[in-house]
């Protein structure tokens, strides 16, 4: 409103100069106080504007820190992955080594068991063979003794008869596995008499 109403300016005269010289002291004090009052407001507005700018635009340092954090997390994740893979590989190799060792031990154990089974079977087989051979030998010997006893009885009988008839008896025999071949020659006064006979054995298999 004050700008629209022009005021008439009076040209200063020489008489008014001393009054104008005295007035600046009072005016300077008022202007200085007004300037001092306005400066804090300007400072406050500048700080608020700077704060708004800071809140709107994050500083480059924070961006760098966030980038560093992401890179660090990536490196840590990679290192953890390598550690886990290394541990898994070590565990797999250890398991493979243990399996190979256990397979070798099992093969040795099975080989020993087979060897022991073969030895036991061979011992049993040999024992059975020896028992069978001993039994056969005992049976044949007993039959041989029976035949020999019979031959001796026959010889004694013929000797007694030859003595009674004043003759002479001569004979021979041959024993095989199944029968007895007997051949007797009796010499009497009337003439020789030859007797041959085959006596089979009753062998039960």
From Swiss-Prot:
Compartments, record wording: Cytoplasmic vesicle, Secretory vesicle, Acrosome
Gene Ontology CC entries for this record: acrosomal vesicle
Region (Disordered): 1-68
Molecular-function GO term, any one: calmodulin binding
Nucleus is among the record's keywords: no
PROSITE patterns registered for this protein in UniProt: IQ
Key word Amino-acid biosynthesis present: no
Annotated keywords: Cytoplasmic vesicle, Repeat
Every IQ domain range: 68-97, 124-153
Compositional bias per record (Basic and acidic residues), positions renumbered to this chain: 1-24, 51-68
GO biological process: positive regulation of acrosome reaction; positive regulation of flagellated sperm motility involved in capacitation
Function: Involved in sperm capacitation and acrosome reaction.
Assembly and oligomerization: Interacts with calmodulin.
Protein name: IQ domain-containing protein F1
């Amino acid at each position: 409103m004050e700008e629209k109403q022009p005021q008439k300016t009076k040209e200063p005269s020489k008489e008014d100069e001393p009054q104008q010289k005295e007035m600046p002291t009072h005016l300077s004090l008022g202007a200085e106080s007004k300037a001092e009052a306005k400066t804090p407001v300007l400072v406050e507005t500048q700080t608020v504007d700077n704060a708004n700018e800071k809140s709107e635009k994050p500083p480059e340092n924070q961006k760098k820190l966030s980038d560093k954090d992401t890179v660090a997390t990536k490196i840590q994740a990679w290192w953890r992955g390598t550690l886990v893979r290394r541990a898994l590989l070590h565990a797999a190799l250890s398991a493979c080594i243990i399996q190979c060792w256990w397979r070798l031990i099992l093969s040795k154990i099975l080989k020993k068991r087979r060897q022991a089974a073969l030895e036991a079977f061979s011992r049993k087989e040999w024992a059975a063979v020896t028992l069978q051979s001993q039994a056969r030998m005992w049976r044949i010997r007993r039959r041989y003794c029976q035949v020999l006893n019979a031959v001796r009885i026959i010889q004694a009988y013929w000797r007694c008869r030859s003595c009674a008839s004043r003759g002479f008896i001569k004979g021979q025999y041959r024993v095989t596995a199944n029968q007895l071949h007997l051949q007797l020659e009796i010499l009497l006064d009337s003439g020789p008499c030859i007797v041959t006979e085959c006596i089979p054995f009753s062998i039960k298999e």
